[in-house]
């Protein structure tokens, strides 16, 4: 019985000390009207596609060995 009381007391203390920390750690989202540049920091699908195009393929031996399937373990 004493262990249960200690566990509940410890969890409640952690809960009450943890709540202000999570409140402070939240990301504050501003409305687009309040920002100076609307769209700044917004990543749309076009930006992701440009990044995918800019990144080349892998030149590693492991990547090429999977295409040939000569090694059943690789």
Swiss-Prot record:
GO terms for molecular function: LRR domain binding; receptor serine/threonine kinase binding. Mostly expressed in roots, and, to a lower extent, in seedlings shoots. Disulfide bonds: none annotated. Keywords: Apoplast, Cell membrane, Cleavage on pair of basic residues, Membrane, Secreted, Signal. It comes from the Eukaryota. A motif (SxS motif essential for MIK2 binding) lies at residues 58-60. The keyword Repeat does not apply. Brassicaceae-specific phytocytokine (plant endogenous peptide released into the apoplast) perceived by MIK2 in a BAK1/SERK3 and SERK4 coreceptors-dependent manner, that modulates various physiological and antimicrobial processes including growth prevention and reactive oxygen species (ROS) response regulation. Inhibits root growth. Interacts with MIK2 (via extracellular leucine-rich repeat domain); this interaction triggers the formation of complex between MIK2 and the BAK1/SERK3 and SERK4 coreceptors, and subsequent BAK1 activation by phosphorylation. Belongs to the serine rich endogenous peptide (SCOOP) phytocytokine family. This is Serine rich endogenous peptide 23.
């Amino acid at each position: 019985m004493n262990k249960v009381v200690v566990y509940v007391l410890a969890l409640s203390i952690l809960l009450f000390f943890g709540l202000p920390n999570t409140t402070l750690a939240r990301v504050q989202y501003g409305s687009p009207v309040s920002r100076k540049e609307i769209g700044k920091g917004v990543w749309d699908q076009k930006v992701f596609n440009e990044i995918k195009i800019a990144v080349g393929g892998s030149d590693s031996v492991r990547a090429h060995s999977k295409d040939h399937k000569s090694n059943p373990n690789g």
